[in-house]
Amino acid sequence: MKDQIKDFIHYVMVERGLSQNTIVSYERDLKSYSLYLTETLHVTDWNHVTRIHIIQYLKHLKDSGKSGKTSARHLASIRSFHQFLLREKVTDKDPSVHIETQKTERALPKVLALNEVERLLDTPKLTSPFGYRDKAMLELLYATGIRVSEMIELKTADVHLSMGFIRCFGKGRKERIVPIGEAAASAIEEYMTKARGKLLKNNVSDALFLNHHGKQISRQGFWKNLKKIALEAGIKKELTPHTLRHSFATHLLENGADLRAVQEMLGHADISTTQIYTHVTKTRLKDVYKQFHPRA
């Protein structure tokens, strides 16, 4: 059964051009699914998997304390995999059809207030190459709203400071052009002229943002730095790698930006994904009203 999972992972990597994070999620979910089938249900052939087996696996996830969102992701991975097996004629049926996970209320993204963003962006000290790099990364994330995975994949050739935009590749390697403001452009220019060469050392790399080995910085490396910077900035809120992306979208909408324009900048295929930020702005307005209105 492991061979078919390997074939599927190769397919999504080569033919569908999915991001590394998505591929890792697929592989992790399917290994967990396969292990449960073989060790708990004693199913050793994909042709013998039934709808009941999948439902039992989803119940196992729930009983293990997994969230509805996690179960939904596992089911999406399982569906894609069984569709692949059917298409490749490994199996003659898709047992995942018509299986639904329990609908869960979508949590509102956590965002920073403007003064918190400013504290965060002002924290990196421009006394070392790492300070210039961290400043440039944070300014870029807040200025563009791009995903952390998109930022770390940026090449030097993707940055067009004189024209005020960057080129990035989103989910499914979909290309998009995103404008950047003066503050971010200035921070990137300073990083490239004063710091990147020192981080590069004797290595050869076209990656824009480098680690201390002169190689492309990893998502985990950025996340570790972000937590450290947030602590220094005195930010008490729980942060995620997407916090600046969420703040970017929310602050744009609060200041009257068009929803479709924000959708395009974020690279959302479906505008309903972008609409979650309109709920965030309404919630924030209610909080302000309750806090400051004398008769709230």
UniProtKB/Swiss-Prot annotation:
<dbReference type="InterPro" id="IPR004107">
    <property type="entry name" value="Integrase_SAM-like_N"/>
</dbReference>
<feature type="active site">
    <location>
        <position position="147"/>
    </location>
</feature>
<feature type="active site">
    <location>
        <position position="171"/>
    </location>
</feature>
<dbReference type="Pfam" id="PF02899">
    <property type="entry name" value="Phage_int_SAM_1"/>
</dbReference>
<keyword id="KW-0132">Cell division</keyword>
<protein>
    <recommendedName>
        <fullName>Tyrosine recombinase XerD</fullName>
    </recommendedName>
</protein>
<keyword id="KW-0963">Cytoplasm</keyword>
<dbReference type="GO" id="GO:0071139">
    <property type="term" value="P:resolution of DNA recombination intermediates"/>
</dbReference>
<comment type="subunit">
    <text>Forms a cyclic heterotetrameric complex composed of two molecules of XerC and two molecules of XerD.</text>
</comment>
<feature type="active site">
    <location>
        <position position="245"/>
    </location>
</feature>
<dbReference type="GO" id="GO:0051301">
    <property type="term" value="P:cell division"/>
</dbReference>
<keyword id="KW-0233">DNA recombination</keyword>
<dbReference type="InterPro" id="IPR050090">
    <property type="entry name" value="Tyrosine_recombinase_XerCD"/>
</dbReference>
<feature type="active site">
    <location>
        <position position="242"/>
    </location>
</feature>
<dbReference type="InterPro" id="IPR011010">
    <property type="entry name" value="DNA_brk_join_enz"/>
</dbReference>
<dbReference type="InterPro" id="IPR044068">
    <property type="entry name" value="CB"/>
</dbReference>
<dbReference type="InterPro" id="IPR013762">
    <property type="entry name" value="Integrase-like_cat_sf"/>
</dbReference>
<comment type="similarity">
    <text>Belongs to the 'phage' integrase family. XerD subfamily.</text>
</comment>
<dbReference type="GO" id="GO:0005737">
    <property type="term" value="C:cytoplasm"/>
</dbReference>
<dbReference type="InterPro" id="IPR002104">
    <property type="entry name" value="Integrase_catalytic"/>
</dbReference>
<dbReference type="InterPro" id="IPR023009">
    <property type="entry name" value="Tyrosine_recombinase_XerC/XerD"/>
</dbReference>
<dbReference type="InterPro" id="IPR010998">
    <property type="entry name" value="Integrase_recombinase_N"/>
</dbReference>
<dbReference type="GO" id="GO:0048476">
    <property type="term" value="C:Holliday junction resolvase complex"/>
</dbReference>
<keyword id="KW-0159">Chromosome partition</keyword>
<feature type="domain" description="Core-binding (CB)">
    <location>
        <begin position="1"/>
        <end position="86"/>
    </location>
</feature>
<comment type="function">
    <text>Site-specific tyrosine recombinase, which acts by catalyzing the cutting and rejoining of the recombining DNA molecules. The XerC-XerD complex is essential to convert dimers of the bacterial chromosome into monomers to permit their segregation at cell division. It also contributes to the segregational stability of plasmids.</text>
</comment>
<dbReference type="Pfam" id="PF00589">
    <property type="entry name" value="Phage_integrase"/>
</dbReference>
<feature type="active site">
    <location>
        <position position="268"/>
    </location>
</feature>
<dbReference type="InterPro" id="IPR011932">
    <property type="entry name" value="Recomb_XerD"/>
</dbReference>
<dbReference type="GO" id="GO:0006313">
    <property type="term" value="P:DNA transposition"/>
</dbReference>
<keyword id="KW-0131">Cell cycle</keyword>
<dbReference type="GO" id="GO:0006310">
    <property type="term" value="P:DNA recombination"/>
</dbReference>
<dbReference type="GO" id="GO:0007059">
    <property type="term" value="P:chromosome segregation"/>
</dbReference>
<dbReference type="GO" id="GO:0003677">
    <property type="term" value="F:DNA binding"/>
</dbReference>
<dbReference type="GO" id="GO:0009037">
    <property type="term" value="F:tyrosine-based site-specific recombinase activity"/>
</dbReference>
<keyword id="KW-0229">DNA integration</keyword>
<feature type="active site" description="O-(3'-phospho-DNA)-tyrosine intermediate">
    <location>
        <position position="277"/>
    </location>
</feature>
<keyword id="KW-0238">DNA-binding</keyword>
<feature type="domain" description="Tyr recombinase">
    <location>
        <begin position="107"/>
        <end position="290"/>
    </location>
</feature>
